[in-house]
Amino acid sequence: MPADGYANPQLLVSSAALNERIGPAGPLVVDLRPAEEFARGALPGAVHLDLFGLSLIDTDPAPMRAYLWIIEHLLATRGVDADREVVVYDECSGVRAARALWFLELFGHTQVRLLDGGFNAWAVEKRKISHEFVAPVATEWHGSRREEVLATWRDVHERLGKANVAIVDTRTPEEHHGTLVRAARGGAIPGSIHLEWTHNLDGAGCFKPAGELRTMYQRIGVTPEREVVTYCQGGYRGAHTYLALRLIGFPQVRNYLGSWREWGDRLDLPLETPTPPSRT
């Protein structure tokens, strides 16, 4: 994956570049895959942290504080420290690693990268895979929250109908159109623009080049002049599009952590059921 064209190329690291630096004196490498995949082999020295399923469905202040404390604590138990670079990965440039990167940016970490192509790229390029696992060394790390990358239901509600805000639905077409219902109600946040997160990746599971990403988002009216709020079902796929937009230099991007599971369950919040495009 060429770095040319990305406004923030430091958010990604290639397999070749990581291979030159991996080791005790190098970055902390965190594997976000399921435990059974990690047990079959991982990058040398990687520590395991599966955050999948640890979701928040109420972004009011009290539950938000408790939830983020848990995530921050889990990251610290795996050795995250403010002074050490962190590289996150999963099977490809996927939602698990993107969500971990978003969490770390939310907590103010300034040296976090995603392994582009993930474990698959590492394996295809025949780099060393380890079956000797290292126990993580916990730290006392405490982040400093960057509220500007986080959206709550109140933040989204306040932005409805504003021309300078783009709300991007990263779910499947079926979820967006309300034919696949995964909450008390189906549908979409009013005025949201739909583009499924998978369009951020190429056929090899790496992020598309910067020019392709810019053109793709410009075509649907998502431009750097607008504040962007991403959402999905629980903040996973939304974090992926957050990263894609960060890569191409969007200055104001938030991920709605509660996403549709919260919005769809709250009967007091508005929704729409967009008409699927005609197949004629």
Name these PLM-found stretches:
Residues D31, D90, D116, R171, ...:
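Short beta-strand/turn micro-motifs composed of small residues
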Residues A46, C92, G234:
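Residue-level signal for short, function-critical loop segments
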Residues P2-D83, E158-E225, D265, E272, ...:
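Positively charged, proline/Ser/Thr-rich regional signature most characteristic
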Residues E225-T230, Y236, I248, V253, ...:
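C-terminal soluble interaction/assembly domains
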Residues R254-T280:
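Cysteine-dependent PTP/DSP-like catalytic domain, specifically the C-terminal lobe
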Residues P2-P9, T59-R159, L180, R237-S259:
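Thiolate-centered catalytic microenvironments shared by cysteine-dependent enzyme domains
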